[in-house]
Amino acid sequence: ISLFLVDAKAPGVSLRAYPTQDGARAADVKLAGVKLGAEALLGTAGDALPVIERAVDYANAALCAEAVGIMSALNEVTLEYLKTRKQFGVPIGKFQALQHRMADMVIATEQARSMATLAAVRVDSTDAAERSRAVAAARAYIGAQARLVGQQAVQLHGGMGVVDELNVGHYFKRLTVIGLSFGDTDYHLGRFSDTLLAA
């Protein structure tokens, strides 16, 4: 595998931009008969796979950290909502069932924070297998926990959890996109098991 630098305006290059679920932008890139000179080659021919794998591991470690930040923000706004929203004359946070759900969200976030820290520490490893194993484990675990925290936050806010006026729905959408970026939870579980089998 080799990497090439291609001008987006070169003949044969077409882009189709579209909005992502979280409001960001992405594009499909189509290459049809694109011709490149030797100067477009980045690095040495055939040596790009380790560079790509390392870059993807760095991107995944960064997404782990972003997801934990969003999970923490969801915990904060949800706790505040439970303290202020009243039902039957008392804050809904007084109901034990909702306290348990909030506690589950906090536990999931703190465990995810530990996994994100593991990914951040190991992403600089010179051992590619160790790096990939740690990052894949973190992505798989955080993907599942982010889904739990996001869904609980939306549910605990009731109908307010999906209105544009609150950040809860926006945070949930971002967690959903993070969960699918560079592979979903099942993909990262597969990567993790592959690194164990190869060891």
What are these regions (language model features)?
Residues 1-76, 80, 90, 199:
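FAD-binding core of flavoproteins
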Residues 54-199:
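Alpha-helical interface subdomain recognition
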